[in-house]
Curated annotation (Swiss-Prot):
InterPro entries: AAA+_ATPase (IPR003593), ABC1_TM_dom (IPR011527), ABC1_TM_sf (IPR036640), ABC_transporter-like_ATP-bd (IPR003439), ABC_transporter-like_CS (IPR017871), ABC_transporter_C-like (IPR050173), ABCC_6TM_D2 (IPR044726), P-loop_NTPase (IPR027417). Induction: Induced under conditions of iron deficiency and negatively regulated by iron through fep1. SUPFAM superfamilies: ABC transporter transmembrane region, P-loop containing nucleoside triphosphate hydrolases. Residues 805-824, 840-869 are annotated as: Disordered. Its main location: membrane. It comes from Schizosaccharomyces pombe (strain 972 / ATCC 24843) (Fission yeast). One of its GO terms (biological process) is heme export from vacuole to cytoplasm. ATP 2 binds at G1260, R1261, T1262, G1263, A1264, G1265, K1266, S1267. One of its GO terms (cellular component) is membrane. This is Vacuolar heme ABC transmembrane exporter abc3. Belongs to the ABC transporter superfamily. The gene is abc3.
Length: 1465
């Protein structure tokens, strides 16, 4: 050995042993598995390291030769040779320096410095000194090279390279960071610097590491779920899955936390050592000054190591929470695509969004508290162990006192769990109703129903949800007080026991009191956190149970339909149902269900058009759903041969461009695409739009008319190249002439789909003549089948009876010869099936078809936006993202909503509580100094001192608990109520343009996540921020009082602290805003997907939509990952400032003692507070940032509160007479209007006069402005120029409620609301049941509703899903019949109903509204042929307005051409 000192010899062994063991393990399990790619681009650094190692080896050999110490030097040479090999392997295979090499070189530097520092005190030769100097120099060179120069030039990992090329987003630096960079979070420094100087955009945020991406995480989650599916037992199974699927991370978190706890409990020991050292200077034999300085250094090192481990622990628990949330979000979405119809009826879209927005958040927050369950008992054990060594058995007596409070806390916990469960149900109810309101806002405005829906939602919100939240707040406050006061009781009892057992032999002096106080403060954390842990665990348990019940809900039976590949046989059966009986709910032992379809025998063949005909509610749409497997098959069998395309009755249009809606993930084929849009009569529509088929349609196709939506949905089906086409009444919402064009282009002798299997439900008698077979449905049964000629000549034919009822209609005329024709080239739609869980296949080419169009791979439904696409016409605006600091106005509005008086009351309570807390420690200092002074008694008047201590402690707990109750319950709930109610009222009063340009996901995000933050998070964050800020100010005051010279260090550290906060807060604030912005598209995508679930399933697009959902999850979570990583970056730097303050306090106390001014009581008092400042400073920064970030939710709510409203509901000084309008005269005077300022005129210079009781038909081609004219009458859009008068009164001078409630409308889209039938007809509850039944009989609904179990109070599912489209339209008719207005507007009211139902509506209107003014917007020209006058619109202008007869006599009129195209002439 080179030294005789055995201690240093052992120190020198440590680096070598570490290199051999750690380096060997890292090489075996990591390096050698990687691909060998020699890469020496950093030429000079690698050769510099090789040269340094070679120099050390040569020197080591030389020294060994000279000193004859062969064994030690041989061992060292072997170690360096192995290190040289590792350096070469690192350079050849790794992108990141090896952790073992970095630590080895650091240890070498430290050990070499130790040898040189202690060389005066140990025997060391000149040769050994030379070796040490060379080793130090070479180790320092290698260490610096390893840290600052990567092994090779930056080369991305392959998975990062793909992401960079596809998205242009930078990979996360954490993958390329060395171990020291990871420990200090320096890898994120460049990003924080960028955020400090730039406003962050989504594209600036780095990618997630691959292990954190949803696509990778969900694989393990699903594998675990499937593997253990047989052992699933309630929600415990999901708990096990969440933990065991990440057991390595859980184990690492636990180990890290336990080591950090040990270091935390080293502090009281060092405080005791410091006090004992200072106390020695009050005796004749003081200790050596070097011992005191070593203690001070140990204080610094222990705190620094604790800081590193604590921040690693915080990073890991956030990572675990994010993984849990990712897996749950992904699994919930995947499950929602698989839910059965009955399961969907019990879980609305609002419920599912609530699972994703609220429940997953509660579960992801749980790891913050969860590991205290392990750490807490360990901390308590350490505290009691140290207290035992400090105070003996008396330390345990205090613990017994805490046991008394356990039953109380158990009761509190049970009550809390019960209340939390009720609260979540109330949140679900509110979310569900809010979703209904947003989805049906147009109807609410047209019917002037804002007030009843407002009252209904406020009842749920204020009477139920906030009331329960207030109860939870009181219960939490009681639990908090009980557990905080436990520490005071434990301390009091322990000190009392010490006096009793040891009072006569030992004084309770500072070296016992303040270490004990520090230990009791450390003991306070697990005890004080226990209520929070219990409440968080209970909240998460409720959420886990809810999610688990959702994940095990019934799924569609994909085996209900037997699917086979398409064949080459020309007329083979493509779709067949044999003796099928179907229902929407599954029959169980407890639940008997009535089948919707009974004994269905149905066949659809290749190359044939099969039509399904029947009255409203007969089961036409249900039959198509049964063919797709979306209903429960109670008996029989269903066979499907080939791929499927589906066009729904209510067209599903997602938020993208028109082209993307048509392609729906298919490759773009210009020729096929061109023929598709011609066949679907879309060419002219594209010419209308500024951007053609690149126009963004908005959510639910907000910028499209009903006919355009239907034809785009139809074009999607045509373009998909399927074998089987299921078309659900696609002709109902298009103009009559367009309908005839579609019939010829698609179903005629040379139609586009003539060589394919087409199943069409229809109310159009015209298309039946083209059908190869017709099925007549009635009450869920097939009552007749045959072709048109067969059914028509049959004496008792159901079809013939209906035709005879309408034999006076011209709708049954043959197709006119002049209908637009298209090339007769046959287009092959090569079949391919895309059904989840089945093998993808492609049929052979049909004999009579070209093989030009093959089945195509599905692509993302939304294409990447290029620079050329920017600036295109969009239907929805980007979400507004505020920049810079949250404005002071936002804070002021929040505190104002809390009540300034209550805020001041909070400050009174918290300042008083902290003052009382300081008073308890000042009293302990005074008591400890008095003890031992008296020669006659070691501890004079102990019970007096204990009584005062207990009194101060009780006051402190009472004040602090009162402050918590004031801020969270009184302020938080008051603010939440005000902000939510104000936002709700504003949104209900917002113009329709707001909803057309704002996705429902954004709005629902405000009402779910942002309202949750305001209710439960913002007040809590401000409470902790104010509490910690005041507490730190008191601590700094104590330190400055006890160590005045520490101001010399504290003042510059304070400015460094402020700079660090300012440097960090800009990035953090922008990340938090981006987090809010990127969350909205996730919920919007969920809502959009669930709205079009049947379409997505039919096309087999589940996987594409799942990938889109995963992408949106990752987009949000890469922002969140950078947010909490940047939080760790600032915390580790701020806490280092706190560590220096603690070191300064201890060093000053030691220095003062050495210089002759020992004061152990004051030093102990100041140190007991100083050790709190590290966490305190970090908490202040984090909580100030959290306060600002969470206040962003307030800012977002205020943004919606300030949305421009419609005109007032009521203008008191301009209220119309009760009987207004008495006549029903309507006049448009030079009326012009736009939907938005940036758009062209939708109506231009309209001048018409409509007499009282006149019947006006409004016609025109698609996009002519027919529905816009109707919206203008209801002031859904406001005039840009001119005015509308009703009975000579300008309608703009009246409030909107007064106007809209005096008009009646049957809208184009029949929207009904979840609840019951009565609420849908009379939400104001003004009418009797008798009156409603009378109206239902007139509307032909009485028989249908009376058969329901609960009659008028029967449940209506979300969106009226349990009623057919025709029934929903008749409910809208019933609403009109319940009003007594003079003006009725029919906006294509019978577009989607059966001809017989159409007749019912028309006859009812003619009979019941003959003395009223009626304006009819029509697609079917025959429905307005008996109108008094016809208004023809084109491009928003009046083209013709005259009597029907006169217009028909004029063969040059547009109306004449429309009537002729419809076959009515």
């Amino acid at each position: 050995m080179i030294t005789a000192n055995k201690g240093l010899s052992l120190v020198l062994l440590i680096p070598n042993l570490f290199a051999l063991v750690s380096g060997g393990l890292q090489y075996v399990f990591d390096v050698r598995r990687r691909i060998f790619r020699p890469h020496f681009s950093q030429f000079w650094t690698i050769w510099m390291k090789f040269f340094s190692i070679a120099l050390v080896i040569i020197t080591q050999i030389y020294v060994g030769y000279k000193t004859k110490n062969i064994g030690w030097n041989f061992f060292s040479v072997v170690t360096y040779c192995f290190v040289l090999f590792l350096q070469f392997a690192e350079q050849s295979t790794l992108r990141v320096p090896m952790a073992s090499l970095l630590i080895f070189w650091l240890l070498k530097v430290v050990t070499s410095l130790l040898i040189l520092l202690f060389s005066p005190y140990i025997a060391i030769t000149s040769m050994a000194r030379l070796l040490t100097l060379i080793t130090l120099f070479c180790s320092l060179v290698c260490f610096i090279s390893e840290v600052y120069v990567p092994p090779c030039n930056r080369v991305w990992y392959s998975d990062d390279t793909n992401e960079v090329e596809e998205k242009g987003i930078r990979p996360s630096e954490v993958r390329y960071a060395n171990i020291f960079s990871k420990l200090s979070f320096s890898w994120i420094s460049s990003f924080i610097k960028f955020g400090y100087t730039n406003y962050l955009k989504e594209s600036d945020v780095w990618l997630l590491p691959p292990d954190e991406r949803s696509g990778n995480l969900i694989i393990g989650f699903e594998d675990w779920w499937i593997y253990h599916s047989k052992n699933k037992r309630r929600s415990l199974f999901l708990w096990k899955l969440l933990f065991f699927n990440h057991w390595k991370l859980v184990a690492l978190i636990t180990i890290t936390k336990l080591i950090q706890d040990v270091l935390a409990f080293v502090q009281p020991t060092l405080i005791q050592k410091t006090i004992l050292f200072i106390s020695s200077y009050t005796s004749p034999n003081p200790e050596s000054p070097s011992r005191g300085f070593i203690i001070a250094i140990l204080v610094l090192v222990a705190n620094f190591l604790q800081t590193l481990l604590l921040q690693q622990y915080n990073q890991l628990i956030m990572l675990l929470g994010m993984r849990w949330k990712t897996e749950l979000l992904a699994s919930i979405y995947r499950k929602s695509l698989l839910l059965s119809s009955s399961a969907r009826q019990n879980r609305s879209i609002g419920d599912i969004i609530n699972y994703m927005a609220v429940d997953t958040q509660k579960i992801s927050d749980l790891p913050i508290y969860l590991f205290i369950i392990v750490s807490g008992p360990f901390q308590i054990a350490l505290a009691l162990s140290n207290l035992y060594h400090l105070m003996g058995y008396s330390a345990f007596t205090g613990v017994a006192a805490s046991v008394i409070l356990f039953p109380c806390n158990i009761i509190v916990a049970n009550v809390y769990k019960k209340f939390q469960s009720i609260l979540m149900k109330n949140k679900d109810s509110r979310s569900k109703l809010m979703t209904e309101i947003i989805n049906n806002i147009r109807s609410i405005k047209l019917y002037a129903w804002e007030t009843p829906f407002l009252q209904k939602l406020l009842h749920i919100r204020n009477t139920k949800e906030l009331s329960m939240l207030k109860k939870i707040g009181f219960i939490t406050a009681i639990g908090d007080f009980a557990w905080i006061f436990t520490t005071i009781i434990v301390t009091t009892v322990a000190f009392g026991a010490f006096i009793i057992f040891h009072g006569k032999t030992q004084a309770l002096t500072a070296d016992i009191v303040f270490p004990a106080v520090s230990l009791f403060n450390l003991l306070q954390f697990p005890l004080a956190m226990l209520p929070t842990v219990i409440s968080s665990l209970l909240e998460a348990s409720v959420s886990v149970s809810r999610i688990y019940e959702f994940l095990i809900a019934q799924e569609l039976d994909y085996n209900g339909v037997q699917r086979f590949p398409a064949t080459e046989i020309p007329h083979e059966i493509c779709l067949e149902i044999k003796s099928g009986t179907f229902s929407w709910s599954k029959k169980t032992l407890k639940q008997q269900v009535t089948p919707t379809l009974r004994q269905i025998n149905f066949v659809a063949k290749n190359g044939e058009l099969t039509c399904i005909f029947g009255k409203v509610g007969a089961g036409k749409s249900s039959l198509l759903e049964a063919c797709m497997g979306n209903m429960y098959k109670n008996s029989g069998s269903v066979f499907q041969c080939g791929s499927l395309a589906y066009a729904a009755q209510q067209p599903w249009i997602f938020d993208a461009t028109i082209r993307e809606n048509i392609l729906f993930g298919s490759e773009f084929d210009p020729e096929l695409y061109e023929k598709t849009i011609h066949a679907c009569c879309l060419k002219r529509d594209f010419e209308i739009f500024t951007e053609g088929d690149q126009t963004e349609v908005g959510q639910k196709g907000a910028s499209l008319s009903g006919g355009q939506k239907s034809r785009i949905s139809l074009a999607r089906a045509i373009y998909s190249q399927a074998d089987i086409y299921l078309l659900d009444d696609v002709l109902s919402s298009v103009d009559q002439h367009v309908s005839r064009d579609l019939i010829k282009n698609l179903f005629g002798p040379e139609g586009f789909l003539r060589t394919h299997c087409v199943v069409l439900t229809t109310n159009s008698l015209n298309v039946l003549k083209e059908a190869d077979s017709i099925y007549i449905l009635s009450n869920g049964k097939i009552v007749e089948k045959g072709n048109y000629e067969h059914l028509f000549v049959s004496t008792n034919s159901e079809l013939k009876q209906q035709l005879s009822e309408f034999n006076d209609e011209k709708d049954t005329q043959p197709l006119p010869e002049h209908t637009t024709s298209y090339p007769s080239t046959q287009i092959s739609l090569a079949p391919s099936i895309h059904v989840e869980g089945l093998e993808t296949y492609s049929s052979s080419e049909r004999k009579d078809s070209s093989n030009k169009y093959k089945s195509r791979k599905r692509n993302p439904i939304r294409q990447k936006v290029t620079e050329d696409d920017k600036g295109k016409c969009v239907a929805q605006t980007d979400e507004l993202v505020q920049r810079g600091k949250v404005k002071w106005h936002v804070y002021w509005m929040y505190f104002k909503s809390c009540s300034i008086g209550l805020i001041l009351l909070y400050f009174f309570f918290i300042i008083s509580g902290i003052m009382m807390n300081v008073a308890t420690n000042v009293w302990l200092k005074h008591w400890s100094e008095e003890n031992g002074k008296s020669s006659s008694e070691l501890n004079p008047s102990p019970y007096f001192y204990l009584g005062i201590y207990l009194f101060f402690g009780f006051l402190s707990c009472a004040f602090i608990s009162s402050s918590s109750l004031t801020m969270t319950v009184l302020c938080g709930i008051r603010s939440g109520r005000y902000l939510h109610d104000s936002m709700l009222k504003t949104i209900l009063r917002a113009p329709m343009g707001f909803f057309e340009t704002t996705s429902s996901g954004r709005i629902l995000n405000r009402f779910s996540n942002d309202v949750y933050k305001v209710d439960e998070v913002v007040s809590l964050t401000f409470m902790f921020f104010f509490r910690n800020s005041i507490q730190v100010l008191f601590i700094l005051g104590v330190i400055c009082y006890s160590a005045p010279l520490s101001l010399l260090l504290i003042v510059p550290l304070f400015f460094l602290y402020l700079y660090n906060r300012a440097y960090y807060v800009r990035t953090s604030r922008e990340l938090k805003r981006l987090d809010n912005v990127t969350r909205s598209p996730l919920y919007a995508h969920v809502q959009e997907s669930l709205s079009g679930l049947s379409t997505i399933r039919a096309y087999g697009m589940q996987e594409t939509f799942v990938e889109e959902n995963d992408l949106r999850i990752d987009t949000n979570h890469r922002v969140w990952f950078m947010f909490f990583s940047s939080s760790r970056w600032q915390a580790i730097r701020v806490e280092c400032i706190g560590d220096l303050i603690i070191f300064c306090t201890a060093f000053y106390g030691i220095l003062s003692a050495i210089k002759g001014s020992p004061n152990p009581g004051l030093v102990g008092f100041s140190l007991s507070y100083a050790i709190q400042i590290t966490q305190g400073l970090s908490f202040i920064v984090q909580q100030s940032v959290d306060a600002e970030n969470n206040t962003v939710s307030v800012e977002r709510i205020l943004e919606y509160i300030n949305v421009k409203s419609e005109a007032p509901e009521i203008i008191p000084e301009n209220r119309p007479p009760c009987e207004w309008p008495t006549d029903g005269a309507v006049s448009f005077n030079h009326y012009s209007a736009k939907y938005r300022e940036d758009l062209s005129f939708a109506l231009n210079n309209i001048n018409i006069e409509i007499s009282p009781r006149e019947k006006i038909g409004i016609v025109g081609r698609t996009g002519a402005g027919k529905s816009t004219l109707a919206m203008a009458l209801f002031r859904i859009i406001e005039p840009t120029e001119g005015k509308i008068e009703i009975d000579n009164e300008d309608i703009t001078k009246f409030g909107l409620y007064d106007l809209r409630s005096r008009l009646s409308i049957i809208p184009q889209e029949s929207q009904i609301f979840e609840g019951n039938i009565r609420e849908n007809l009379d939400p104001n509850h003004r009418l009797t049941d008798k009156k409603i039944w009378e109206v239902l009989e007139i509307a032909s609904l009485k028989n249908c509703i009376s058969q329901l179990e609960d009659g008028l109070y029967s449940r209506v599912a979300e969106g009226g899903a349990n009623f057919s489209s025709g029934q929903r339209q008749l409910i809208c008719l019933a609403r009109v019949l319940l009003t007594s207005t003079r003006i009725l507007l029919l906006d294509e009211a019978t577009a989607s109903v059966h001809a017989e139902t159409d007749a019912i509506v028309q006859q009812t209107i003619r009979k019941r509204f003959k003395d009223r003014t009626i304006l009819t917007v029509a697609h079917r020209i025959n429905t307005v042929m008996d109108s008094d006058r016809i208004l023809v619109l084109d491009h928003g202008k009046v083209v013709e307005f005259d009597a029907t007869k006169k217009l028909l006599e004029n063969k040059d009129s547009m109306f004449y051409s429309l009537a002729k195209e419809s076959g009515l002439i």
